[in-house]
Amino acid sequence: NIAKELLKAGYEPALFGYTDTSLDPRDVPKGDKRLTTYENVLPGFKRIAFTGSDNEKGDWHGYLEKKGYDKIPTTAYAIDEQDLNSSTYFQQEFLPPSLYKEEDSDTAFLTQEAIQYIKKNKNQPWSVFLNYLSPHPPFVVSDPFHTMYNYKSVPNPIRSESIDQEAKQHPYLKYCLSNKRDGENWYFNDGSYAANMEDRQLKKINATYFGMMS
């Protein structure tokens, strides 16, 4: 456990962002609800600026509320959820931008918080674990990054001629192609399978992903 090792060495393990950690069942009471998720914070880290999880709002949400955003959701990732289904979502030339401005993104928020922490603690031992979510589903990014790359210039995805042929490559791939639905990663509401997405749709997702990287 790197956080506990840092504590032994005299450092405060400061967390900015999140850690996806499955807790050791030997260390928590039987039936603890934290055992049902891998989105826990690694024991030993001190949460300085937490972006939240599926079950918990984070410091970023409080920041957005203070900035006057009026559509703050109850979970970390729902901030990027679009109230659209997949059939209308892809009819636009570019996927919609995020609800928040570039300067208010979780990336910008964490960066500023980490800089302030380092400045405050520069004369004493310190350690910073700064973990950005982006680029990562859900695939949405703030203006102007959502229009930075046109999907028409994105290469076509490499696919087999049919889903059945694709599935023959590996049993796990067969499972994913049969069970992975859009909503698990892209927050669409129609329950369709990701494997059935058109090349054009996937290219628009890739174009948005490139914007997230930028």
Walk through the language-model features, giving the residues of each:
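Active-site-proximal cap/lid insertion segments
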Residues: 54-55, 59-112, 116-214
